[in-house]
Amino acid sequence: MSSVRFLTGITTSGTPHLGNYVGSIRPSVRASQTAGVESYYFLADYHALIKVDDPARIQRSTLEIAASWLAAGLDPERVTFYRQSDVPEIPELTWLLTCVTGKGVLNRAHAYKAAVDKNTATGQDPDMDVTAGLFMYPVLMGADILMFNAHKVPVGRDQIQHIEMARDMANSFNHLYGEHFVPPQAEIEASVATLPGLDGRKMSKSYDNTIPLFASREQLKKLIAGIVTDSRLPGEAKDTEGSALFQIYQAFASEDETATLRQAYAEGIAWGDAKQVLFERIDREIAPMREAYLGLINNPAKIEAILLAGAAKARNHATPFMATLRHAVGLRRLSDMGSTATKKVAKVALPSFKQYREADGLFRFKLVDAQGQLLLQSLGFASPKEAGQAIAALQRDGTAAMVTLSHQLEPLAVDTDTVGAALNLLATGT
């Protein structure tokens, strides 16, 4: 049984804070260690360009976010961890998807609609300050997901639309050019941890109420001391309901620790003492990671090497897959022309190659006809590049390649002529 492929994007537009850690980094790192899961994590620096026009900020954010995830335990050997802009196949796929995505679909995108509604409400031109990047943002996100045929994409409920739009793009492309993409599914956690900030509102850079994830001990203690509390004196019972301090503590503490602080609230613990308890609990978890983070942040060359290695791993899949997609849409070598006929013929459903990874870690592919019937099945390859090269040989040389690759193929499910006809159909598109 093949593994389930998860994909997570991280926009490089700010410095990670405790809310990011509790809501995304910590659960994602834990999930990446699950057996039978193939995880892709990417730094979405192309996406950041839509929000940020400060080059230094994007570069610094990329460094800080990469260092934060690595310090929190993300294993680049176990997962594929890469920078979006290091995989040129992604913007190329964006264009292919742009050509099958209706403008009406993009008109309904939440970010674009919100910008238009805001302008309309203030009497401005609906598209004032709306860039093509903002409008096309869902297509780029679709390319991120579909390039690696992710099965599951963890998102909040407010981001489900992005996955639905990626599914639409996949289905549109598959309808026109054959089955190439797996329509992704949104993975929604029943309860995503959301931390309150210093002022009690959701911890967010927008409210400037965050606690940086790897603030120094001194800064962490100072920021925690600034958490807004009520005026109840020491000895007066205090409510845990609505207490930002208690909610933050709960996100880090065990059930027993939480119960102990709840009892202390009931007994009238002083706010200063409660803040000290919170500081010590957070620092106990963060301190080991802080040391690792500082080591990484002061060695950007090490992070760069990790990201480039991750990009190379990602491109082992992306490059041969993109070659298949280019061929599918007609971006082919003229020497591969299968017919001189100039008459327009009706579009027919084509056979297709499907490449995937099994639980044993090996990469395989199969050739199916337009109805999904299995025609050809490979044995396992050590890398997706090797599998992609075999597919390319079959597409180029047809049945001749079947002889050359016979030691890497399962016994045929059908006769050789049927497979040969399918390969010729795939090569010519007719």
Give the role of each language-model region.
Residues 161, 170-360, 370, 374, ...:
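Conserved nucleotide- and phosphate/pyrophosphate-binding catalytic cores
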Residues 2-7, 12-142:
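N-terminal Rossmann-like or analogous alpha/beta NTP/dinucleotide-binding catalytic cores
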